[in-house]
Amino acid sequence: MNSIDILKEISNSNNGLIQTKTALEQGVSRASLSKLCKDGKISRISMGQYVLSEELHDEMLSLQLRSNLIIFSHESALFLNKISERTPFEHAVTIPSSKTLSRSISSECKIYYIKDDLHELGKTQLPTTMGSLVWTYDMERTICDIIRSRNRIADETFLSSIKQYASSSHKNLA
């Protein structure tokens, strides 16, 4: 089996994402990855992550795999919880206030900080539009975050999300 076939198998089993670590474990060398990238067979989306050229990649999954601290929140969580129909231009993530993210991740998303002991509160897994499961906050935590950070959120997003949540039959008021 040649390198591209191995990478197709990896891609199929990992929601379209090929990580260098996984490719190396399967016998594909870094030189092969570089050559396939130059030949246009695969595309590098970030350090250590590739996709097959003909496929779209899941940005949220890519971000999540680059840091285990990331939990999608605010506008991104509104979208994942189906409170908002609008895809956010920039993904919003929350991390513990005692931690930092790499510059490459920080440049791609809006970062919110929270006390370490509150970081895991309301954490759940939901599917992205591409079907990958990512960590995000549940509806109730998301609404609390939106209210807490309303000065950093567009007025239209704030008001529509509160109205949408209030009219939702899935809210948990207990």
Stretches found by the model and what they are:
Residues D5-N14, I42:
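Basic, Lys/Arg-rich alpha-helical nucleic-acid-recognition elements, primarily the DNA-binding modules
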Residues G40-M47:
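A short, conserved structural fragment
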